[in-house]
């Protein structure tokens, strides 16, 4: 893998000091094994190499061969390298760097080479003959790439944002991005797929490439999930289950390819557990270990009903079953989740809402690197693919499609297993699904209405903020809490903003800690398999999350696999840690709010009367009865910290 950056000036010579500044930011903020550069007056390309796989030891980019008039670099791990090697005439045993393979494939196929690549990649190509720059993103933007068109007509691109803001120092904040962050509900920091907190700096969209000339910047789409079909046979349940497991294993096998050790960020959830189990089985055949890392509370916590607050026991059951899993239980040394806020913001370069999760992930990645791991597996996309399948989603879909016999059969089977009254369940389902049908039928027809749910946000934030246009244009629909039927599921799978955000997270964390984060549940083949699969199979015959439950009967301990009602709660002690350290934390939070109140750019966004009232009521001890209020305050705290960091840099 790599970090890539560069600048094309179509008219004037590029300032070499600006190029040096870009390089320095990568040297000081990323764990890179080598940095190579190419400079030729109006062209500058930089590339930092991470030696993750054996082929990357010989990687040397940018590639600039005068005979071809092409400057080429890529941030990539290619999963179908053997196919590409064969097409290019290499022997099976030849060790060829992935970047070199892509370069030669581009020379052979030109831009059509994108139809033959599978893996993680962001690519920059400059063609001297027609004075054109191509910037390319893979189908899910798993490697982020930013770009900025300067007022001088030049184009700057970079894996990280700061090298661009260092080269062009007067880029203003994008107020709409910050308002989106504060106004939209949920843990996503962004609602747009391509915008950033800096006006004019954009991210590449999934499955697209840019064509940049002196006159224009044009985005072209080359990937369409509707046309990308990995499986044509969903004949029956046995075929689906068997095909799914084989495909899942292939995705994991590709993900664990590395010259170093492999780690997994593991819980007892079905997605990360199965990813880890498959990885352990594959690595065991090579006499290698899987290093697993599980976050657990600092002090023991009792489960609340079906909610598992401490996953130590269940994870240990998995570890006991697979001797080559080397388990580690971590708790961030008992630190509070906002102690490392500045560090997280410096890595991510955007404000974040998942402030609870990030510090613990940083600890996992840092420890994995120290243990010699170059790949860290995750299953965070699993709820959209391998472990999708809440029973309500499939039952509602069958009901709305008028598949009443199948609906009743699934409902009866489910109720029998969980020992629930079928009569009561049927009555509740019909009432719930009729409501869902009504909500969906009027969605998009009713007048746009949206109430900001963050109590600390002032209505003044709506000034010069086209909320309706931004929500509608970016396909953000907030309706009642209803089941996800097939059409809504497919709409979600196509939602680009989620992919570009996850790409930012995985790319930047990987560069910071010297690893590559890979999620087999987000492999484009798995996304395609699930997207095109008949929806009923997600909870086939009334079995929630049927894909995993049907195909991992021997691999997952029965207490985990067959307990349909269990739900693991991650970071369960985050609020108790906040309360424990509140007397210390509230001092800084008060100072931060005073700073915000005096900042002309931010002060109009917030209701300081409510903020000060909350802080006054909780001055001595944090009341945990209203966790939503705590989160809402932390989002404001995060934005203010982000603004301060941007000022300093």
Give, region by region, the residue ranges found by the protein language model:
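Cysteine-centered catalytic environments shared across enzyme families
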Residues: 1-331, 343, 347
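Adenosyl-5′-phosphate
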Residues: 1-10, 14, 52-53, 200-205, ...
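Hydrophobic (often cysteine-bearing) scaffold residues that line and stabilize catalytic clefts
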Residues: 15-18, 95-98, 117, 174, ...
């Amino acid at each position: 893998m790599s970090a890539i950056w560069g600048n094309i000036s179509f008219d004037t010579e590029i300032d070499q000091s600006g190029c040096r500044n870009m390089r320095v930011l990568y040297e000081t903020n990323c764990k890179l094994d080598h940095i190579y550069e190419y400079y030729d007056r109006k062209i500058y390309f930089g590339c930092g190499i991470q030696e993750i796989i054996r082929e990357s030891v010989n990687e040397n980019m940018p590639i600039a061969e005068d005979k071809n008039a092409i400057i080429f670099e890529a941030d990539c791990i290619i999963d179908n390298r053997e196919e590409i090697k064969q097409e290019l005439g290499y022997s099976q045993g030849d060790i060829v760097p992935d970047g070199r393979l892509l370069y030669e494939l581009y020379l052979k196929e030109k831009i059509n080479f994108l139809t033959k690549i599978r893996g993680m990649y962001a690519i920059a190509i400059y063609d001297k003959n027609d004075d054109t720059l191509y910037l390319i993103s893979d189908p899910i933007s798993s490697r982020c790439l930013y770009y900025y068109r300067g007022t001088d007509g030049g184009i700057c691109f970079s894996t990280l944002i700061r090298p661009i803001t260092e080269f062009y120092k007067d880029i203003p904040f994008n107020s709409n991005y910050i308002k989106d962050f504060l106004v939209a509900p949920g843990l996503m920091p962004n609602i747009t797929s391509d915008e950033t907190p800096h006006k004019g700096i954009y991210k590449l969209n999934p499955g697209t490439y840019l064509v940049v000339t002196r006159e224009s910047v044009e985005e072209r789409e080359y990937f369409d999930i509707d046309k990308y079909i990995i499986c044509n046979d969903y004949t029956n349940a046995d075929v689906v289950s068997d095909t799914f497991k084989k495909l899942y294993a292939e995705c994991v096998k590709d993900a664990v390819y590395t010259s170093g050790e492999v780690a997994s960020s593991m819980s007892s959830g079905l997605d990360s557990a199965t990813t880890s189990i498959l990885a352990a089985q594959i690595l065991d055949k090579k006499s290698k270990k899987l290093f697993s890392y599980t976050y657990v509370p600092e002090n023991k916590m009792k489960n609340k009903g079906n909610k598992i607050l401490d996953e130590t026991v269940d994870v240990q059951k998995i570890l006991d079953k697979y001797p080559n899993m080397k388990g580690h239980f971590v708790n961030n040394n008992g630190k509070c989740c906002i102690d490392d806020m500045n560090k997280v913001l410096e890595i991510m370069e955007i404000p974040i809402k998942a402030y609870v999760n990030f510090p613990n992930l940083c600890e996992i990645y840092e420890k994995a690197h120290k243990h010699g791991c170059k790949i860290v597996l995750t299953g965070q996309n699993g709820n959209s693919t391998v472990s999708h399948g809440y029973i309500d989603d499939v039952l509602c879909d069958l009901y709305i499609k008028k598949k009443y016999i199948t609906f009743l059969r699934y409902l009866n089977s489910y109720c029998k297993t969980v020992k629930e009254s079928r009569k009561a369940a049927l009555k509740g389902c019909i009432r719930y699904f009729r409501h869902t049908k009504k909500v969906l039928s009027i969605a998009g027809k009713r007048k746009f209405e949206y109430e900001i749910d963050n109590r600390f946000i002032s209505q003044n934030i709506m000034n010069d903020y086209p909320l309706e246009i931004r929500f509608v244009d970016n396909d953000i629909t907030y309706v009642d809490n209803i089941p996800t039927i097939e059409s809504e599921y497919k709409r979600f799978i196509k939602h680009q903003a989620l992919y570009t955000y996850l790409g930012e997270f995985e790319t930047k964390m990987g560069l910071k800690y010297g690893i590559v984060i890979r999620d087999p549940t987000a492999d484009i083949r798995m996304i395609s398999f699930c997207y095109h699969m008949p929806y009923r199979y997600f909870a086939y015959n009334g079995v929630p999350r049927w894909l995993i439950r049907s195909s991992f009967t021997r691999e997952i301990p029965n207490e985990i696999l067959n307990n349909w009602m269990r739900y693991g709660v991650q970071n369960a002690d985050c609020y108790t840690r906040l309360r424990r350290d509140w007397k210390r934390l509230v001092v800084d939070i008060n100072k931060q709010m005073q700073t915000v109140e005096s900042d002309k750019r931010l002060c109009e966004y917030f209701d300081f009367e409510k903020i000060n009232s909350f802080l006054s009521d909780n001055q001595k001890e944090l009341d945990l009865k209203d966790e939503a209020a705590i989160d809402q305050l932390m989002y404001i705290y995060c934005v203010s910290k982000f603004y301060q960091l941007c000022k300093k840099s």
